[in-house]
């Protein structure tokens, strides 16, 4: 007689084994209608799974995070079923869940067209209406291989052969479609429906360019149609904000294919913004007690063996280069360089904490298919910092880091966060004592800062717990940004030491910390967050002076000179064009303030001020305009509201 404990602590007892769906119905008809899966003693399972012994069970509903995962996974299977029903020659490979959706890779002799996607999506909706039961079956390794060989599914056979012997194999049937899968899945195809196929891309089998090219169909799926509609609206808004298009229009940056993919060229306008970002970052770090470092771009290959990168990270590193019999490699990270500086002399406990920061360019060997504008590149500048401290200083240092993170991100207009605390995984280095103390220090620092967070149990790196922070942009998207990572591994690998109060040699704690993640990616996020309409303190051109005719060019230049001497990024448009044309041109350039001058302004020593939204701010003296722009720039104001 199974005794089932529910999340609220209540119990349900049954005279005989029951399925998850039976349990859901016993709790309530509404819950049963919303149910898509269940967690049994923490393990996600199908609703059809039998509960034949005592267990803690939570019914998973369609609108929960687990529920969305199951819906998206099941929709990927629905996609594969639809493709094979329309194109029997297509072979299925893999179809995982990704952020906000799913994809499925197919071996198909030609590329899928937009018309194909329409037909596939229509077929998927027809299969939903059929409300086909989704059934799980267990097979032996031999039977599974025989089944998929008979079906001509070569890729599935390859996958099965790679699975360790003795590991249970399951497949799922819905109608005449069969797929190898661990599950779980929705009870029937009728549960699905709020989905949209989005695009097709090429993808190599197993991500290896030596393997066949597959056709990858991307889609999104949601619990309800209203959620899908909201997401598609967000995508449409995101398309308007695409940093690649805006970056080209505003001449901020480019990717030059003649030089290679994933390598960013900063144009003059983008370089101005970058300089503002970096100057603020440096100023904030110096105020917070950091010293700034500069380190090389390459190092002996042996250094990367010492750090462990050659063992655990070599696929993301560019190949070594040879010089006089010595192998060098581009750095994928800055940490070993900071450690070498630390080891240049012996430190006392009184020297700690040591806080070092660097805007260091690193290089990652990203696959070409993964590259995406500024968001995924091969060469980028990390806003890297490392704190070397004693165990008793961890909490205070993490607290100080969180203060700095919020100060810097808040200045750019980001004040809504999603925070995860990732704890010790199964395989790790370091004693129980140091892990427990360090994890508690991170908790305490978060709670003292009044920050809400979720615990990602077992999600930490093998060398220490960490805090990850995502920022939310203007249209509600979340971007991984800041990371605070404790490291018990590198100090040991590099034999780092400090002299403790009792004279003993001890190993310091190392804190890795980035706030932006990378300058390039953060700039891409900024472009999309502001839709290229940077606040005045970030704008590459803060004000442009527009004479209504060439007769006022000299006066316009004198106005610009006054502003430039105040440190304002001002320009003058002396083209022989109508004033309406100039206003439109610089509005499209997203210049915050347009200063129009003619006879009246020249006589009075004034300018007519308007913002890029077309609001008339009145006629003001040159000094008043300069003082206001200077004040807004120095205060790092994030709105267009005139502060005069």
Swiss-Prot record:
It is an enzyme of class 6 (ligase). Zn(2+) binds at residues 335, 386, 512. Residues 1-61 form the TGS domain. Residues 242-535 are annotated as: Catalytic. It catalyses: tRNA(Thr) + L-threonine + ATP = L-threonyl-tRNA(Thr) + AMP + diphosphate + H(+). CDD domains: TGS_ThrRS, ThrRS_anticodon, ThrRS_core. Pfam families: HGTP_anticodon, TGS, tRNA-synt_2b, tRNA_SAD. It comes from the Bacteria. It is found in: Cytoplasm. Belongs to the class-II aminoacyl-tRNA synthetase family. Catalyzes the attachment of threonine to tRNA(Thr) in a two-step reaction: L-threonine is first activated by ATP to form Thr-AMP and then transferred to the acceptor end of tRNA(Thr). Also edits incorrectly charged L-seryl-tRNA(Thr). This is Threonine--tRNA ligase. It comes from Acidithiobacillus ferrooxidans (strain ATCC 23270 / DSM 14882 / CIP 104768 / NCIMB 8455).
């Amino acid at each position: 007689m199974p005794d089932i404990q529910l999340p609220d602590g209540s119990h349900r007892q049954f005279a005989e084994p029951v399925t998850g769906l039976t349990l859901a119905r016993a709790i309530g008809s509404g819950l049963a209608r919303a149910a898509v899966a269940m967690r049994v003693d923490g393990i996600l399972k199908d609703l059809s799974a039998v509960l034949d012994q005592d267990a803690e069970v939570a019914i998973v509903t369609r609108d929960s995070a687990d529920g969305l995962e199951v819906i998206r996974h099941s929709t990927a299977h629905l996609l594969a079923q639809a493709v094979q029903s329309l194109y029997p020659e297509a072979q299925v490979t893999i179809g995982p869940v990704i952020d906000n959706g799913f994809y499925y890779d197919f071996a198909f002799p030609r590329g899928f067209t937009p018309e194909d996607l329409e037909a596939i999506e229509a077929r998927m909706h027809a299969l939903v209406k059929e409300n086909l039961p989704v059934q799980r079956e267990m097979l032996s390794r031999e039977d599974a291989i025989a089944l998929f060989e008979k079906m001509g599914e070569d890729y599935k056979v390859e996958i099965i052969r790679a699975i360790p012997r003795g590991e249970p194999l399951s497949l799922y049937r819905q109608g005449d479609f069969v797929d190898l899968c661990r599950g779980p899945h929705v009870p029937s195809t009728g549960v699905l429906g709020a989905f949209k196929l989005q695009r097709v891309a090429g993808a190599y089998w197993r991500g290896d360019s030596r393997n066949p090219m597959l056709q990858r169909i991307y889609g999104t799926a949601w619990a309800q149609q209203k959620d899908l509609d909201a997401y598609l609206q967000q995508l449409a808004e995101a398309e308007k904000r695409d940093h690649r298009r805006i970056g080209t229009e505003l001449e901020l940056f480019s990717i030059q294919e003649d030089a290679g993919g994933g390598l960013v060229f900063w144009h003059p306008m983008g370089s101005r913004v970058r300089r503002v970002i970096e100057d603020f970052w440096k100023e904030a770090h110096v105020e917070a007690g950091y010293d700034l470092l500069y380190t090389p771009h390459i190092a002996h290959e042996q250094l990367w063996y010492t750090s462990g990168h050659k063992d655990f990270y070599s696929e993301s590193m560019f190949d070594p280069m040879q010089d006089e019999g010595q192998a060098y490699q581009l750095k994928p990270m800055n940490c070993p360089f900071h450690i070498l500086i630390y080891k240049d002399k012996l430190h006392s406990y009184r020297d700690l904490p040591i806080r070092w920061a660097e805007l260091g360019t690193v290089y990652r060997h990203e696959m070409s298919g993964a590259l995406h504008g500024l968001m995924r590149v091969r060469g980028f500048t990390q806003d890297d910092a490392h704190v070397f401290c004693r165990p008793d200083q961890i909490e205070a240092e993490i607290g100080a880091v969180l203060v700095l993170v919020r100060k810097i991100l808040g200045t750019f207009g980001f004040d809504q966060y999603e925070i995860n605390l990732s704890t010790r995984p199964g395989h790790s280095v370091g004693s129980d004592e140091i892990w427990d103390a360090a994890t508690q220090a991170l908790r305490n620092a978060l709670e003292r800062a009044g920050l809400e967070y979720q615990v990602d149990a077992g999600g930490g790196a093998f060398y220490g717990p960490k805090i990850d922070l995502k920022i939310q942009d203007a249209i509600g998207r979340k971007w991984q940004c800041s990371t605070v990572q404790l490291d018990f591994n590198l100090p040991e690998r590099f034999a780092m030491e400090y002299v403790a109060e009792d004279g003993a040699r001890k190993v310091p704690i190392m804190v890795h910390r980035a706030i932006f993640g990378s300058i390039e990616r953060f700039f891409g996020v900024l472009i999309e967050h502001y839709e290229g309409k940077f606040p005045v303190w970030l704008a590459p051109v803060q004000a442009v002076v527009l004479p209504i005719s060439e007769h006022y060019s000299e006066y316009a230049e004198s106005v610009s000179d006054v502003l430039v001497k105040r440190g304002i990024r001002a320009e003058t448009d002396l083209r022989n064009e109508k004033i309406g044309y100039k206003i439109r041109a610089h509005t499209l350039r997203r210049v915050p303030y347009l200063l129009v001058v003619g006879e009246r302004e020249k006589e009075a020593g004034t300018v007519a001020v308007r913002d890029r939204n077309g609001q008339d701010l009145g006629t003001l003296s040159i000094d008043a305009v300069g003082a206001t722009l200077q004040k807004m720039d120095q205060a790092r104001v994030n709105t267009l509201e005139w502060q005069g």
